[in-house]
């Protein structure tokens, strides 16, 4: 069985054993990356859970002035109370300029059970729509026809570990790294390397997307954050950080929830922007 590097596979309560205010270990830190420019990634958000303070536990993305997209394993199957969560919009350094927003409701995909089973996707509705500006505005969702072919250069962002067991240090800057898309069938073969499961048992499913290599990858630290790609001059969200084995390890690309696979479900709740 794959050793998943997730502490939030079932519930954000698992994160609360960590000392504050260090970023909590989930999937997605940035390996091989650098600090992001303050003018970039205006859709990036930090999700917070109430502990002794509002602790960062996952990333997310603003996809509409009133909606945030994240991973289902961040929200959990059993925590239904939106008052336990807060959202911090684009922030260069965690905790240094917090203006936390309240959440009206959480919506977890009904088919989610574990990250390996897929459907690792969730929505948070904000109580009040945000004021869109050059510093804060939503990321565009891709058309259903967009495939993000193998080799496409995309970007993943977050506040997580910078390598296996190497946490991001204060002042906790937002990090970014460029990662190549890995075609699903190739990614699946890579994940079968060294395992005894039969090749006919898929690990990487249609609703998943792979990206990364031994030089650049997501790591522990910010599950739920966005994987974005620039297509014909427009930034599109290709994936949601979900899971993986290790950080930038051979034959183990990062695995993301494929946004196009869940567009119909997203738009049951989130109005389409013109």
Curated annotation (Swiss-Prot):
Homotetramer. The active tetramer is converted to inactive monomers at neutral and acidic pH in the absence of heparin. Low concentrations of inactive monomers become active monomers at pH 6.0 in the presence of heparin. When the concentration of active monomers is higher, they convert to active monomers and then to active tetramers. These monomers are active and functionally distinct from the tetrameric enzyme. In contrast to the hidden active sites in the tetrameric form, the active site of the monomeric form is accessible for macromolecular proteins and inhibitors, e.g. The keyword Phosphoprotein applies. Transmembrane segments: none annotated. Disulfide bonds join 58-74, 154-229, 187-210, 219-247. GO terms for biological process: proteolysis. It comes from the Eukaryota. Residues 1-19 form the signal peptide. It is found in: Secreted. One of its GO terms (cellular component) is extracellular space. PANTHER family: CHYMOTRYPSIN-LIKE PROTEASE CTRL-1-RELATED, TRANSMEMBRANE PROTEASE SERINE. The keyword Cell inner membrane does not apply. The modification Phosphotyrosine is found at residue 96. One of its GO terms (molecular function) is peptidase activity. Keywords: Disulfide bond, Glycoprotein, Hydrolase, Phosphoprotein, Protease, Secreted, Serine protease, Signal, Zymogen. Belongs to the peptidase S1 family. Tryptase subfamily. InterPro entries: Peptidase_S1_PA, Peptidase_S1_PA_chymotrypsin, Peptidase_S1A, Trypsin_dom, TRYPSIN_HIS, TRYPSIN_SER. Its EC number is 3.4.21.59. SMART domains: Tryp_SPc. Residues 20-29 form a propeptide. Glycans are attached at residues 104, 131. It catalyses: Preferential cleavage: Arg-|-Xaa, Lys-|-Xaa, but with more restricted specificity than trypsin. Tryptase is the major neutral protease present in mast cells and is secreted upon the coupled activation-degranulation response of this cell type. Plays a role in innate immunity. The lineage of its organism: Eukaryota, Metazoa, Chordata, Craniata, Vertebrata. The active site is at 73 (charge relay system), 120 (charge relay system), 223 (charge relay system). This is Tryptase beta-2. Residues 30-271 form the Peptidase S1 domain.
């Amino acid at each position: 069985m794959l050793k998943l590097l997730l502490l939030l596979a079932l519930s954000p309560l698992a994160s609360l054993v960590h000392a504050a205010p260090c970023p909590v270990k989930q999937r997605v830190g940035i390996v091989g990356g650098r600090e992001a420019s303050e003018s970039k990634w205006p859709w990036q958000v930090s999700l917070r859970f109430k502990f002794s303070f509002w602790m960062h536990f996952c990333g997310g993305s603003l996809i509409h002035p009133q909606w945030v997209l994240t991973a289902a394993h961040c929200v959990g199957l059993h925590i239904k109370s939106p008052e336990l969560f807060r959202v911090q919009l684009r922030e260069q350094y965690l905790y240094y300029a917090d203006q936390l927003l309240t959440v009206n409701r959480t919506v977890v995909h009904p088919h989610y059970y574990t990250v390996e089973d897929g459907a690792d996707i969730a929505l948070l509705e904000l109580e009040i729509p945000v004021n869109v500006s050059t510093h804060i505005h939503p990321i565009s969702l891709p058309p259903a026809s967009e495939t993000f072919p193998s080799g496409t250069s995309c970007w993943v962002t977050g506040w997580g570990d910078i390598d296996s067991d190497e946490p991001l240090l204060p002042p906790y800057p937002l990090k970014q790294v460029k990662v190549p898309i890995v075609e699903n069938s190739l990614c699946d073969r890579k994940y079968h390397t060294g395992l005894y499961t039969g090749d006919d048992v898929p690990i990487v499913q249609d609703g998943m997307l792979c990206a990364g290599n031994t030089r650049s990858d997501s790591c522990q630290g910010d599950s739920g954050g966005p994987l974005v790609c620039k297509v014909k001059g427009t930034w599109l969200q290709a994936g949601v950080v979900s899971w993986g084995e290790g950080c930038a390890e051979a034959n183990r690309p990062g695995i993301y929830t494929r946004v196009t696979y869940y567009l119909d479900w997203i738009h049951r709740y989130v109005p389409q922007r013109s």
